[in-house]
Amino acid sequence: MSLMSETMQSQPEQLRGMLADTTGVDAAAERLRGRSLFLVGTGTSWHAANIGAWFLRAAGVEAWPVQAMDAVLYGPRPAGGEGLILLSHKGTKTYTTQLLERARAEGVPTAVISGQGAPGAEIETSVVERSAAYTASHTGAMLRLAQLATALGADLGPLNGVPDAVAEVVEGPAVGVVPPRRAMEFVGAGPNQWTAAEGALKVRETAYVASAGMGVEQFLHGPSVAVGTDDTLICLDGGGPGGERLAQVARSAGSAGVPVRMIAGDAPNELLSVFPLTAAVQRIALETAETLGTNPDSFGRDVPARASALDGIAL
């Protein structure tokens, strides 16, 4: 069994632990209350930052997701009257580290959401992962963001149902998406456009399959033209107002011979649907890697020349 598979199976229990132990959440909420907030991350943490912005806007917070590199090199970045929520699996990435140092030096209040024992963590998520394909730390970061938004006044629904919703997916039958001959496309509406982006990232880094993930309207206006019978379109339905548009796009693609899978998130509302749908795209990535015989844990370092190429870049 891969490390990714083991970690995915551990998610429900780790999420229950986070619901039981909210250390740091209330204190962070008080530091950030009444401020415009920047949510910053890289890779999977960038997807969490965008979903977190949806949660925080439900609390009436002005929330701005920004890529870590962009914040450091270009801006915008938080100033004195604003706050920073920084997301990092291990607290070691180049630009998130630089941004955190700068923010603290300038007196910007922060909430650092990271793995257990990670440098600078103010709100801890999961046990630090051994697989390069981050899963539990992502669902954990989303739960911490939901808790933070709730502490700031958001009514997101019953967070105590999140672990069981994730368990139903990771412990259930295979999702069963057959690897396409060419590309795997993920689309979603509302917050689940970022679940779609996470699905594409996971499929690429675990199974080495060409993939893209985006909002359903963005997909329709251009990218959909390139999708054909050698591809697979995966539609992530969170049950919100964009669901009808998602169904229209799915029907249109299917009528052109594109293999289409519609996956619904079993949750009380669209915002909480990101949890079971994230678990679903994790399973799709893992199942694709297992079918194709790739190593989902290695970040491609077992591919000839890839390890030495990556060693020349500071992540």
Predicted regions and their residues:
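Active-site diphosphate/adenylate-binding microenvironment
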Residues: T206
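Glycine-rich phosphate-binding loops that contact phosphosugars or nucleotide phosphates
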Residues: G24, L32-G172, A189, S224-A267, ...
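Internal active-site segments that recognize and position negatively charged phosphoryl groups
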Residues: P173-E198
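An N-terminal, well-structured beta->alpha segment
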Residues: M1-R35, E168
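A structural supersecondary motif
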Residues: A212-E217
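Phosphate-moiety recognition in structured ligand-binding domains
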Residues: R251-L315
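Conserved phosphate/anionic-ligand binding catalytic regions in large, soluble enzymes, centered on
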Residues: M1-M4, H47-I51, E198, T278-R283
